[in-house]
Amino acid sequence: MEKAIRNFLSQESAGGILLLVAVALAMLMANSPLSGLYQGFLGTDVQVKIGELDIHKPLILWINDGLMAVFFLLIGLEVKRELLEGALSSVAQASLPTFAAIGGMLVPAGVYLLFNYGDPVTQAGWAIPAATDIAFALGIMALLGSRVPVSLKVFLLALAIIDDLGVIVIIALFYSTDLSTISLVIASLAIAGLVGLNRKGVTSLLPYGILGLILWVAVLKSGVHATLAGVIIAFCIPLRAKDGSSPSEGLEHSLHPWSTFFILPVFAFANAGVYVGNMNLETLISPVPVGIALGLMLGKPIGVMVFSYIAVKLKLAQLPDGIGWKQIAPVAAMCGIGFTMSMFIASLAFEHADPMYGDLARLGTLIGSIMAALVGYFWLSKVLPNKGV
């Protein structure tokens, strides 16, 4: 298990650097004479028409609805593996990261609502600071190399996976609108087919892919966010075949480099380009960016620490072996790295609002995530021993 985690983190570390490059490039283009080219590229109409099926969207929505569905497929595969065989497969293992994740979602949302309560438009962004970017958070931790105990890495990984599961539920419950009955019926039939394949022990990925594509189109047309199709597909792919092989893990390993080095950087490039030329101090301290930034910088670590402490004191959970509160605290700060996940929720929360709100949300996410990354990294670096453990 330790080798698998180290391989995972080494990939995430390189991916984290690529994410930073993508964000910097997006900000540069959005605030330079290339701004028109950048916006025009993302607004390029892309149409797919097969018979009566017609999907017509700008490029940025193909990225957010299509590529991110593949990312959520990967997240779903990771969640399923951890639930059945990994860090979440027993109550004892799952208790602490579960309580930590719940606190890390509730408190940031509460902080955001403190600044935005009463405004029906901005209130929609309450879930933005509740997210943790698993790739970026693990990438920052990986920069400290062998100084980080494996048990601490597993804690962050488990916490982030539960956080992702929470985000999936939030998207399904709060960011799905104008539901189409016909599309939902088709989606239900596709899900029934996927479950049937699983029950029959089918291990070939091709039929899952065909039904999965039908499911994605149906969910896209239904009003439920299309990324949820990826999670459903993942949960239906068998973890273990009769011969002991793992179709699920095989697909997970194949998707990881695509997610780390293509999907997430492309998403970051498409969504992080915030034009700041028309912003002033009053804009920067407006409720949306302040609520998000403080939710990530303060709400996340406070929520993670308080809920973890209560769970341990009530003997509902226990700290990982060899790990104390002084190591948990900087990891809690790292959970405030919302980055791509927070930006994704922002794109849903303010999809039909003035584009200014989306810009403010992305700006708050960038500020909060960068501060959380810096504080978490230097704090953890200070409390860890200088030599490998």
UniProtKB/Swiss-Prot annotation:
UniProt superkingdom: Bacteria
Ranges annotated as spanning the membrane: 14-34, 59-79, 95-115, 124-144, 154-174, 177-197, 213-233, 257-277, 292-312, 328-348, 363-383
Cell membrane is among the record's keywords: yes
One Gene Ontology MF term: sodium:proton antiporter activity
Main location (coarse class): membrane
Membrane topology: Multi-pass membrane protein
Keywords: Antiport, Cell inner membrane, Cell membrane, Ion transport, Membrane, Sodium, Sodium transport, Transmembrane, Transmembrane helix, Transport
Keyword Endoplasmic reticulum: no
Catalytic activity: Na(+)(in) + 2 H(+)(out) = Na(+)(out) + 2 H(+)(in)
Annotated localization: Cell inner membrane
Gene Ontology process terms (BP): regulation of pH
Record GO cellular component, one term: plasma membrane
Record-linked PANTHER family: NA(+)_H(+) ANTIPORTER NHAA, SODIUM ION/PROTON ANTIPORTER NHAA-RELATED
Protein family according to the UniProt entry: Belongs to the NhaA Na(+)/H(+) (TC 2.A.33) antiporter family.
Task of the protein: Na(+)/H(+) antiporter that extrudes sodium in exchange for external protons.
The protein's name in its UniProt record: Na(+)/H(+) antiporter NhaA
Lineage: Bacteria, Pseudomonadati, Pseudomonadota, Gammaproteobacteria, Alteromonadales
